[in-house]
A protein has these predicted regions:
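Membrane-embedded helix-loop-helix hairpins and adjacent transmembrane boundary segments
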Residues: 1-507
């Protein structure tokens, strides 16, 4: 227990120290939100990876999908690396950096408002982002707290409050630069931790080959006379597995907190280097998490919840509980790192969106600050400082709201994530990507995709999820491209000279 406490205290002190160190660079909006658009490839790649993989993945998804699909769940991690990281950086990285810098966009809602010349899109996009990031944040709290209860015996309520306080401190102090620096430190812990944990868990089962053989001997859930499904290449349910891969891999392309990493990177050379770093990070962390979760059935049946469903969130903790204290301490730091980095990214994204796209969207100054229609440098600096203060206040507000949900958590972690990813990526992915590439994308098509992505997700939830939330999210994302394309064919195009000026950044 002493080892676990010491390592955790050191970790928290380092995180807060980085926030204090970075506070001078967080005095302006660009500095607070984007790190001055000068963050290097290593910090950006690790910020992308650590925001991608949190306790939602390590505890929720790895446990649930490892139980359902066995060792074939590893394909989810492979998809996350190839589609969610490699292709995301190749397809979105350069164009996002160039266009957002060219049109002076700081957030995804700001991009929609400027690219499609619609303040209405900007406002609605910011509301969608703010509302649907809350359930994802609550899921992050739930995941880390499950591990803390196992490792320290600390009640769930204390865990979420402690985590929220320390995350708020370093984000409020240092903004994006502090978040990126901490993400790098946390990413190193995650890489080392996942490799060590996999080795320890497999060793407890007699080694890799013995563990795989045990998995091959397990009977199928649908037919007890059939063995081997949980150790096969595609697993017992390949079609639903594909839905999970699409949601968790393609979904990142439309999430504001993920795409925002491309806004802040320094230049095109850094993007090329960051692509490689981010992909390798995802292979190790995501591939490792799902590979580990694939062995969950070797550790007994999980508890049954009052609603009659299995408690999938308990599977990974049950695999780790018999490990030595040092390994458990490493696991706690691993998940704490993953969760705090994701939480920091989420609250920073939400607060910046609310501040820049709702409160200050028309860039108004206070009465008496404008003389003869011009804002001088002193006034402009004053407005910038005020925006940063508002963002810091909203960080506290967002954390409190998500904390209240986390203290009374609905449904499973994976379903929470499925709802938020489905709505956000279903609404944003297609219009964002096509807005970067296709000049004929219309404003009406973006509105249609917002309605499509949010509508299908919410209606499915209100009807009691007749379509699995994971599959519904995948349908929302893929269908969004059809919606944007079809509506763009039959609706009014933007003025050609306006669009050409926006696309000058690629010349």
């Amino acid at each position: 227990m002493v080892i676990k406490v010491i390592l955790t205290l050191i970790f928290i002190l380092v995180m807060v120290g980085v926030g204090i160190y970075s506070r001078k660079q967080a005095s302006s909006v660009d500095g607070f939100v984007l790190g001055g658009r000068s963050v290097g490839p290593w910090l950006t790649a690790f910020a992308y990876g650590t925001s991608y993989f949190s306790a939602v993945v390590f505890v929720g998804y790895a446990g649930q999908f490892g139980w359902k699909y066995g060792l074939s769940a590893t394909w989810i991690g492979v998809g996350n690396a190839i589609i969610g990281s490699l292709l995301a950086w190749i397809v979105l990285g350069r164009r996002t950096k160039l266009m957002t810098q060219h049109i002076d966009s700081r957030t995804m809602p700001d991009f929609f408002g400027t690219r499609f010349d619609s303040q209405g899109l900007r406002v609605v996009a910011s509301v969608i982002a703010f509302v649907f990031l809350i359930p994802y944040t609550a899921g992050v709290y739930k995941g880390i707290s499950t591990l803390f209860e196992m490792g320290f015996g600390i009640p769930y309520e204390y865990c979420v409050v402690i985590m929220a306080i320390f995350t708020a401190v370093y984000v409020i102090l240092g903004g994006y630069k502090a978040t990126a620096m901490n993400d790098f430190i946390q990413g190193i812990i995650m890489l080392f931790g996942i490799v060590t944990v996999i080795a320890a868990v497999l060793n407890s089962q007699g080694g890799l080959f013995t563990a795989v053989q045990k998995m091959a001997e397990l009977p199928s859930d649908t037919d007890a006379t059939v063995n081997g499904g949980f150790a096969s290449l595609l697993g017992p349910d390949p079609w639903n597995l594909l839905g999970v891969i699409i949601l968790t891999s393609l979904g990142t392309w439309g999430l504001p907190q993920m795409v925002g990493k491309f806004y802040s990177i320094t230049d095109e050379q850094a993007i090329r280097r960051g692509t490689i770093i981010s992909t390798l990070f995802a292979f190790v962390v995501a591939g490792g998490c799902y590979f580990l979760g694939g062995f969950g059935r070797l550790f007994g049946m999980p508890p049954v919840l009052p609603n009659g469903r299995l408690d999938f969130d308990s599977i990974v903790p049950s695999m780790l509980i018999t490990l030595p204290d040092f390994i458990i301490a490493l696991v706690v730091l691993l998940v704490l790192s993953a969760s705090m980095s994701t939480l920091a990214s989420l609250v920073l994204t939400s607060s910046s969106t609310m501040t820049l796209d709702l409160i200050y969207r028309d860039k108004k100054s206070a009465p008496g600050e404008v003389e003869e229609g011009a804002i001088d440098d002193i006034v402009a600096e004053k407005i910038e400082r005020r925006k940063v203060v508002v963002m810091r206040v909203l960080i506290v507000f967002f954390i409190v709201i998500s904390l209240m949900i986390a203290l009374n958590p609905p449904t499973f972690i994976a379903q929470l994530m499925g709802i938020s990813w489905g709505a956000l990526a279903g609404a944003f992915l297609a219009p964002f990507m096509m807005g970067l590439y296709w000049k004929n994308t219309t404003t009406a098509s973006v509105w249609a995709c917002f309605v499509w992505g949010v509508g299908i997700t919410v209606i499915n939830m209100l009807l009691g999820n007749p379509i699995n939330p994971i599959n519904c999210g995948a349908i929302a994302m893929v269908g969004g491209f059809v919606v944007v394309w079809l509506v763009s064919l039959f609706t009014k195009k933007m003025p050609r000279n306006t669009v050409d000026k926006i696309f000058e950044c690629y010349d």
